[in-house]
Amino acid sequence: MKKIWLPILTALAFTTPAAAQEPQPRPDQLIFRDIFKELIETNTTLSSGSCTLAAERMATRMKAAGFPDSQLHLFATPEHPKEGGLVAIYPGTSKKAKPILVMAHIDVVEAKRADWERDPFTLFEENGYFYGRGTLDVKSQAAVWVDMLIRFQQAGYKPKRTIKMALTCGEETNGAFNGVEWLAANRRDLIDAEFALNEGGGGDSDGKGKVIGQSVQVGEKTFANFRLETRNPGGHSSAPVPDNAIYELAAALTRIEEHEFPVELTDVTRRYFAEAGAARGDATGRAMIALALDPADKAAEAIVNADPFLHSNLRTTCVATLLDGGHAANALPQRAGANINCRIFPGHSIESIKDELARVIGDPKVTITQLPPKRPAPPAPPLDPKVIGPMERLVAKYWPGLTVIPSMANGYTDATFLGAAGIPTYGIPGMWGDPDGNGVHGLNERIAVQSLYVGRDFMVDLVKAYAD
C-alpha cells in the first residue's frame, strides 16, 4: 500500500523542478532508471509473478557492484518459493551507533493487460510520467534503495551507522506469506535497527507539477475483518415466516451503517489537523484547526466529515464489503452473511471493536467472527527529533516554504510487523503523487518522472543524514 494522498493543501503551491520543462537525465539517473525498469518488468503479482526472481535480480546487480555474499541474504521458504526477498547490509564504522533499516515491498497488486492502456509489466515513459504496475507502489522506493547501496559501494562511502535494506513480498495481499513478518519472527538479527524508513509518507502535487505538501507517516490504523452470519431453518418461499436470515442480517448491517464511532486524536493526528488545517486556509482548514483544539466541536466535525479521508482519520470505521445469502430462488434463506472491514484507531483492541459491533447490532442471533489474517496493533512510533529533524531540514531545502506534516495512515503497511517487533518505523517524505491517486491499485499506474528523480535524490540525502 502506497500512501493514500492526504488533502494537505489547496490554496498554496510551491514550484518544483517538475513544473519546468523536463531536463535531460543525468548519467546516474539513467543507470538508476535501468534498475527501476528491471523491477517493473519483473512480474511480482501473487497469481503469476515471483518476488524471489526480483530479489535475485537485485542481488545479482549488487554482487556485480562488489557486495560480498556475506552482506547479501536472499530468503524464501519451501512453502512459498516465489515469495522470497533480499536483505542487504552495508556496514558502518561505528560500533556504538545502531543500524538504520530501509525497506520496500516488491510485490504488486494484480494487473490485467486487457484492462490497461499499456502492458502493466513494461516500463513506458510518456508525457512526463513513467507507467507500469508498481511505479509508485512501491518499486520506485525499492529501486532507490538498491541503486543507493550500489553507489555507496562503488564510491567507498563509509557511514557511521550500518545501513540495512529489506526488499520483501506479501504486503499487498491479505493472508499471503509476508516477508517482514517472517524476518521479524525468524531472522530478527538481519533487520534489527534503531528505526526503519518505509513507504506511507510522501508528497502531494496539484497535478500540474507543483508540490503542495510533504508528510511523514507516524503510525497507522490496524484492520480486522469480521464475518456476520445469521441462520434460520428455511423453508418454501410460498410460506414466509417472521424469522428470515436475510432480513435479520440486513437489519444488523443497517445498524452498523448508522453507527458513527467517536472522534479521537493522537498526538500525531492532532498535529496533522492543526498544521494541515492552517496550511489550507479554507473552511475545512479552519474546522480542522478547531477540532485539533476541541475534538467535541460538533460544528467543526460536520464540516470535516464531508471529506472521506479526514472523516476516517478521526475515528475507527467499519464498513460492509462482501455479502452472501440464500441457496435457492424459491426457498427461504437458511443462511446470510457479510464481511465487515474495520480500520481501528490506535489504542483499541480488535476484541473491543468486536464487542462494540455486537452492542450496536443488539441481536444475539447475529454471530460475529473475526477472520484471518490477524495482524498486530503496535503503538505509533514517537515523534523523535532525531528522525523528524533531518526530514524537516531536507524538505525545507528541496521545497522552500514547505514543512513536514506528521500523519497517521488510515490503511496499513508492513510497519505493523516492525512496530510490533520494537522497531519504530516511519513513512518518509520525498516522492509525490497527483490528486487522482496515480492509478495506485488501479489502472494505468504512473509516477511523474521528476517525482521519481527528485524523490530519489531526497531519499539518498536523508539516509546519509542519518548514517553520518
Where are the regions that the model predicts?
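Acidic/His- and Gly-rich active-site-bordering loop/insert found
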Residues: E22-R133, A142, F152-R161, I340
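Solvent-exposed loop/turn segments at secondary-structure junctions
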Residues: T45-S47, E79-P81, T93-K95, I106-E110, ...
